[in-house]
Curated annotation (Swiss-Prot):
UniProt name for this protein: Putative manganese efflux pump MntP
Primary residence: membrane
Organism: Stenotrophomonas maltophilia (strain K279a)
Gene Ontology terms, MF aspect: manganese ion transmembrane transporter activity
Pfam families: Mntp (PF02659)
Name of the encoding gene: mntP
Physiological role: Probably functions as a manganese efflux pump.
HAMAP family: MntP_pump
Topological relation to the membrane, as annotated: Multi-pass membrane protein
Annotated compartments: Cell inner membrane
Length: 191
């Protein structure tokens, strides 16, 4: 997998966490960098671990699905991408009515981080069928998430109304394109 594809996956995996961070940043009275960095580290570590778990699960099943692995990668990335696009286009839920002061403790951040990293676990399953170093991929996903969450919280008030949902749509489109590229390259013997 090319370095550009790795970076794009890292970016795509961090967009849902970025969208969540914008909401958290907008809900905080005055987010300070230390709090934003703390949230970024929590989200980044979780987001880096989940694709490794998915990759291990995928590797365990590799011998059974090697003949159609490209279809699995395409299906997983495509489905996740479409789901992210759908969530980005969907109207906001009632979670905005909740007390914002209850969303910034360690366990709340960790739970939110895990919820936004389920897609990274599924991507990890797909990565098990590709020629990619999972350690590098996990590190890139974790660093992208750390950066995006920290920035999302700091710019939450400003970006909340402008970018929030669009970030998830962009991430979904990127996943669909990468999935289609994997399928195309396998079917046409490219790469």
């Amino acid at each position: 997998m090319s370095p550009i594809s790795i970076l794009l996956i890292g970016f795509a995996m961090s967009t849902d966490a970025f969208a969540a961070a914008i909401g958290k940043g907008a809900a905080m009275r005055r987010p300070v960098f230390r709090d934003a960095l703390r949230a970024g580290i929590i989200f980044g570590v979780i987001e880096a671990i989940t694709p490794i778990i998915g990759w291990l699960l995928g590797r365990a099943a590799l011998q059974y699905v090697e003949a159609f692995d490209h279809w699995i990668a395409f299906g997983l990335l495509g489905a996740l991408g479409i789901h992210m696009i759908y969530n980005g286009l969907r109207p906001d839920s009632a979670e905005e009515d909740e007390d914002p002061s209850q969303h910034h403790g360690f366990w709340k951040l960790a739970l939110t981080g895990f919820a936004t990293s389920i897609d990274a676990m599924a991507v990890g399953i797909g990565l098990a069928f590709m020629d990619v170093h999972i350690g590098v991929m996990a590190a890139v996903i974790g660093l992208c998430t750390l950066t995006m969450v920290t920035a999302g919280i700091m710019f939450g008030r400003v970006l909340g109304s402008m970018v929030g949902k669009r970030a998830e749509i962009i991430g979904g489109v990127i996943l669909v394109i990468i999935g289609a590229t994997i399928l195309y390259e396998h079917l046409h013997g490219v790469g």
